[in-house]
UniProtKB/Swiss-Prot annotation:
Reported function: Catalyzes the transfer of a methyl group from methyl-cobalamin to homocysteine, yielding enzyme-bound cob(I)alamin and methionine. Subsequently, remethylates the cofactor using methyltetrahydrofolate.
Protein's recorded name: Methionine synthase
GO cellular component, one term: cytosol
Residues at which methylcob(III)alamin binds: G750, D751, V752, H753, D754, S798, A856
Region (Disordered): 873-925
Name of a matching Pfam family: Met_synt_B12
Gene this chain is encoded by: metH
Amino acid sequence: MRVTAANQHQYDTDLLETLAQRVMVGDGAMGTQLQDAELTLDDFRGLEGCNEILNETRPDVLETIHRRYFEAGADLVETNTFGCNLSNLGDYDIADKIRDLSQRGTVIARRVADELTTPDHKRYVLGSMGPGTKLPTLGHTEYRVVRDAYTESALGMLDGGADAVLVETCQDLLQLKAAVLGSRRAMTQAGRHIPVFVHVTVETTGTMLLGSEIGAALAAVEPLGVDMIGLNCATGPAEMSEHLRHLSKHARIPVSVMPNAGLPVLGAKGAEYPLQPDELAEALAGFIAEFGLSLVGGCCGTTPDHIREVAAAVARCNDGTVPRGERHVTYEPSVSSLYTAIPFAQKPSVLMIGERTNANGSKVFREAMIAEDYQKCLDIAKDQTRGGAHLLDLCVDYVGRNGVADMKALAGRLATVSTLPIMLDSTEIPVLQAGLEHLGGRCVINSVNYEDGDGPESRFVKTMELVAEHGAAVVALTIDEQGQARTVEKKVEVAERLINDITSNWGVDKSAILIDCLTFTIATGQEESRKDGIETIDAIRELKKRHPAVQTTLGLSNISFGLNPSARQVLNSVFLHECQEAGLDSAIVHASKILPINRIPEEQRQAALDLVYDRRREGYDPLQKLMWLFKGVSSPSSKETREAELAKLPLFDRLAQRIVDGERNGLDVDLDEAMTQKPPLAIINENLLDGMKTVGELFGSGQMQLPFVLQSAEVMKAAVAYLEPHMEKSDCDFGKGLAKGRIVLATVKGDVHDIGKNLVDIILSNNGYEVVNLGIKQPITNILEVAEDKSADVVGMSGLLVKSTVIMKENLEEMNTRGVAEKFPVLLGGAALTRSYVENDLAEVYEGEVHYARDAFEGLKLMDTIMSAKRGEALAPGSPESLAAEADRNKETERKARHERSKRIAVQRKAAEEPVEVPERSDVPSDVEVPAPPFWGSRIIKGLAVADYTGFLDERALFLGQWGLRGVRGGAGPSYEDLVQTEGRPRLRYWLDRLSTYGVLAYAAVVYGYFPAVSEDNDIVVLAEPRPDAEQRYRFTFPRQQRGRFLCIADFIRSRDLATERSEVDVLPFQLVTMGQPIADFVGELFVSNSYRDYLEVHGIGVQLTEALAEYWHRRIREELKFSGNRTMSADDPEAVEDYFKLGYRGARFAFGYGACPDLEDRIKMMELLQPERIGVTISEELQLHPEQSTDAFVLHHPAAKYFNV
């Protein structure tokens, strides 16, 4: 066990030794048994519902319950003290009895435990501490009040003889900390130390009540020195598995679980718990085998009968009949907010610690704090989050201010508002303490040093007392009694002293120490400061070489003090890069002000490097060079500079530029001024639409990315909405698009995808067209009815599925039949379409005009051309538009000629082909070992931690494919890599934080299973039982290639003949994953509210998170499938995540409707096998999954299985 300041004492019990030797069994529910005890109101002394008073009035009843659980096989029972806390007993006006009732309850359990203890079977008592009814994080009560009440309760338990304290059903991390530290204080007072166990409660939403992910709970709890962590209450075992998996994989202490007997259902007697004793025992035995648990038991709805079955199952684990899983812990040193954990390691980058929430470093923050404008302070914190910070440095120290009051006000608010952990930065011990008492997550303390020594009254000792008690991480500055260390040797010497002191005397892990090697400005020109940059870099390198587990950090911006803002930005960025190369782990910095190294002009970068490394030479001083390069240059990224540039433009040019820039600030003022000079409709047609035209040109030339296009459309929409109330009624028709034309848009029947169609809607409607957006799954009948009713000029159809291309062809044929082809030109778009298919094949089918629109701006161009022709507007000969139209016509003529030539060649080749004999089976090896599945049938998984599967998110698919972040060609603008750093990853981090906080990502779920199967020719047969002669449940038929290797999916499953010969069938896994309906609803709300860029980004995240979850679960299946010798299928997995996207693992995952398995009807059979309605997924008549962010597949384990087409 890890030694910390909290647990370096000797325990007065052998409980932990017993836990290390075998799996132990806890008891079940107390409340359920009390309800069956036929107690009267007199038994409760009129305090109905106060179970703790029974410790005084009916100890006999409690003794009986404890005895039943022990006799059922429990090793430990919990005391009847769950509500012995200030809020519960305070509600009955008996808060003064906390210690007394805690002692009485413990004595009762102790008496029964001692009575039933034998030499072969010792019985133990856990002192139960519940959460109470008031949550300190939400300000219901104060931390110290809660902590002190828990101290009283723990003193009673120690007096009564408890073997350990169990802090259970924790809903608030700050309440949890109060209970743990209150218990530790009681042990110090009593002079008796016992272990402390913690059980957190994760709701069906996948987080604790206040939104904490399991990773946040672990990061906050483990450093407090607790001896075991686990889960209890709220759900049954099925909903707990993923959270247990996280604890098993990452906790360095024992893990336990006490689930409810399932989720309650409404029965004849009210709410009932459905899980039967054998079902609970089976689930817990599975957890022991999979997660290596140390303690299992039951919570609500469980009885002695449940515990009897559990004890029997655990006995089989302990005697080796059933294997107990081995835990392979991957420790990730982290800090946490209330909501999420942030690892110190942020490779390949560094941990960015936002510096703007600092009263000494930010004038704006300081003034807001002094004015008690806390909302502005919080907005600054949010800006740091959006800017890419991982932590927030919070400093309220300012002369003349009450730092404790300021810290309480800000830390208390940030606790619930910020998803980022907090670094508490103060020289005042009471201020640091106030922060720690308002933040339940694991904080960083900034900082300690030896400036006034390390004596008992030194600030070092006083600060470390807080660090050790609260389990915080700590920044340690290389300062000793002689002052700040400036040379490599001195920095390393002081760092060694700090590391040895903090680990040996305070029990803090090396991984929780952030050594600041200090940096000083190198911009003064003074000789003694010229080498300071080199000394810091070399000290970091040497320190990481000696102590790789120790974190390193820097207050980065000190290096550039004295330079102008733009020069500072460059020097800070270059210095950070050099420090990072030397091993720097984190930096206190304004993250959005750091430039990617490849975006800094070479001359500036070289001057900064020369300054850092003091490369002066005759006639060359890099400091002077850098100052000369930035003379009179202000920071190009500052808002103030951009506003000043806009202000210089003429009014109407400025309005158009605001559209191009997507800049809404100042828009209303400009529009008001513009309306004094021309009518609103003229402003729209002559100026705002000019801006949108420029946006289209920039997008078409690759100089503007799709997210910024949508930002421009948002501003256009806002401008039109602002002008509409000032228009004449007839002019308001612009809002309906009558000035330019009308299009009816729809996603075709059977297709639920609408992102592309909605982007077309956004671009067309903000360029003067009326768009009638019918939504998804629209039959042609409805499309044409609306087109006729609205007198549409054009019909637009979209679809993502391959099947949708067939539907589009059928729709065009129907339009021919109805005689409307000449009336309605048609625009077609969608991922499955190609230009060739539309302009050649479909153009032959349709009797009117049909056009392919690759994207929204091509759709706009086509609309302009169609409407110009309808209005009889001829293009001026020789004009750019006329020349472009002529070029398009020539290209179309060439394409059609090529198409006709290709068709003739294809017909000739087919006629010349000789018949090929297709074999019954391909050359795929049939004699491969079949892995053993962990179970047969299906299981559901809920409550998945977002952090578990975001590692499988394909960034390139998101940033390039979904968001359209494309670098500018020819070096005339940011590259794709630049955009990833400046836009992609910061926006992704922002959205993941925001969506997690809103609870939108809490509904991710999986249903998956393993099914016995054999192959017969081109069929895979799923069997009712894992026997070759078992009955058929379902049969899937797949096509076979007619040339080449003659592959068929059935070839990758063991044949029935071989299965019969070996008496062993094959295994066919199926999986279905979903992100749930809330993210789809959230996306829809963004579209309706005209938040176009947000709409694009969140939709893309939803799609790619679904794919990430599918990839993650596919890996889980490979981990669970084991071959002889206990070798898992995942042993062949690649190390790099990127290789997963290149299928760099064994086997493959196939989805019906694509490639080698084109029959989408087979999805019905898979749905019947998996029953995904249990996780909220249904299938439509068109065989589409709902919610949209869902995907399904079957998995082939065969090593030769790869994707192929038929």
